[in-house]
């Protein structure tokens, strides 16, 4: 009797398997007719590239070892970010997101002439044009992470001068001092500056998280960082892309690009810690002096430039050569400045990576959710 049951079970199993495809079995892509192999999604670059473009990968019928099997064609595009991957800290959720973002910006796609990587990047202004002067950004495409927060109501939004910086598809980072007790209702992304700020997209704000150690009631600027959650996920375009976050690798002494709320940009340099401390001696906002682990001091290369328009939240980024794809690498943003010689104290992003990651890319059951 036991023998008959075993035979019946085997027949049933073979019948079930015949209705699907096992890992390693052949498959055919329905849309292109290309031959593939049933492979776990996590091991299939072509399926990942399809998902980055918003396309559902073609599934094989069976689930093997709890891994979703997809019809996987051979990798046909050159790999991205090989050098960057070696520089990024292992296990950093911010760094992992940066790599994922680059795949979305340059998806592997099939064309009539073969396979190539797409590109939604804007043609960035050569940095040689902004070495010693402040020059305007024609559109937000030159700083696609850049936006502003607003108050009021739809159709009559008042946009503040204080910038915000997009860091994922649903969160922006900004100065805690800037939002203070203001009821921030909207965030604008993309758009143009002239004749007035006009965003491409407007988002509601559903949550605000101010760093627990920020003490704005006493006008002390330490831990000047906040996060705002948007009411829906952002669709990335040429003019709307998150910035990658600087995670703590060594910084150069010059070449930072500072953008301000009027759509102007300039090249900044980093003074010595001693010089920075001397500039902010006895400053009421820094009773313990400039704290190098959480702040970055910067000066414009052209120290005669006007700096009154640099509002809290103005991003401090690294130059094109150190960017991932066409994203900016956000090192910090303006927290405070003194008018002469336009010395700026910037919140240092790398100090707050653990706090940011736990909010923007939380982990549940060992998986980023």
Locate predicted features.
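Classical protein tyrosine phosphatase
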Residues: 2-6, 156-190, 246-259, 324
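Conserved H-D interstitial segment of serine endopeptidase catalytic domains
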Residues: 147-152, 172-175, 179-215, 272-281, ...
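N-terminal activation segment of mature serine protease catalytic domains
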Residues: 106, 110-156
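Chymotrypsin/trypsin-fold serine protease catalytic domain
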Residues: 225, 230-231, 236-303
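Cleavable N-terminal signal peptides of Sec/SRP-targeted secreted and luminal proteins
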Residues: 3-20, 187
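Short, solvent-exposed loop/turn segments that connect beta-strands within catalytic domains
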Residues: 155-158, 195-198, 217-220, 285, ...
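C-terminal subregion of chymotrypsin/trypsin-like serine protease catalytic domains
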Residues: 2-4, 21, 32, 41, ...
């Amino acid at each position: 009797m036991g023998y008959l049951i075993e035979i019946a079970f085997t027949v049933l199993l073979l019948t079930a398997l015949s209705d699907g495809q096992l890992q390693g079995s052949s498959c055919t892509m329905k849309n292109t007719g290309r031959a593939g192999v049933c492979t776990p999604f996590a091991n299939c670059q072509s399926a990942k590239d399809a998902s980055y473009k918003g396309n559902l990968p073609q599934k094989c019928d069976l689930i093997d070892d709890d891994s979703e099997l997809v019809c996987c064609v051979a990798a046909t595009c050159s790999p991205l970010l090989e050098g960057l991957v070696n520089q990024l800290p292992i296990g950093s959720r911010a760094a992992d997101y940066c790599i994922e973002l680059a795949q979305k910006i340059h998806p592997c796609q099939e064309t009539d002439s073969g396979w190539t990587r797409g590109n939604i990047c804007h043609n960035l202004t050569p940095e040689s044009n902004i070495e010693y002067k402040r020059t305007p950004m024609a559109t937000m495409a030159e700083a696609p992470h850049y936006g502003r927060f607003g108050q009021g109501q739809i159709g009559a939004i008042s946009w503040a001068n204080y910038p915000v910086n997009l860091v994922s598809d649903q969160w922006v980072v900004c100065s805690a001092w800037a939002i203070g007790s203001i009821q921030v209702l909207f965030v604008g992304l993309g758009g143009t500056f002239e004749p007035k700020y006009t965003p491409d997209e407007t988002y509601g704000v559903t949550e605000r998280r101010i760093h627990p150690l920020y003490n704005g009631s006493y006008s002390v600027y330490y831990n000047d960082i906040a996060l705002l959650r948007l009411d829906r996920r952002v669709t990335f375009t040429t003019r709307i892309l998150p910035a990658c976050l600087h995670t703590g690798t060594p910084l150069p002494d010059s070449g930072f690009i500072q953008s301000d709320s009027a759509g102007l940009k300039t090249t900044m340099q980093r003074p010595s810690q001693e010089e920075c401390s001397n500039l902010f001696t006895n400053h009421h906002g820094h009773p313990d002096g400039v704290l190098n682990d959480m702040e970055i001091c910067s000066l414009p290369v052209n120290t005669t430039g006007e700096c009154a328009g640099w509002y809290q939240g103005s991003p401090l980024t690294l130059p094109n050569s150190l960017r991932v794809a066409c994203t900016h690498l956000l090192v910090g943003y303006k927290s405070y400045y003194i008018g002469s010689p336009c010395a700026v104290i910037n919140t240092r992003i790398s100090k707050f990576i653990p706090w940011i990651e736990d909010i923007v890319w939380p982990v549940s059951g060992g998986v980023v959710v």
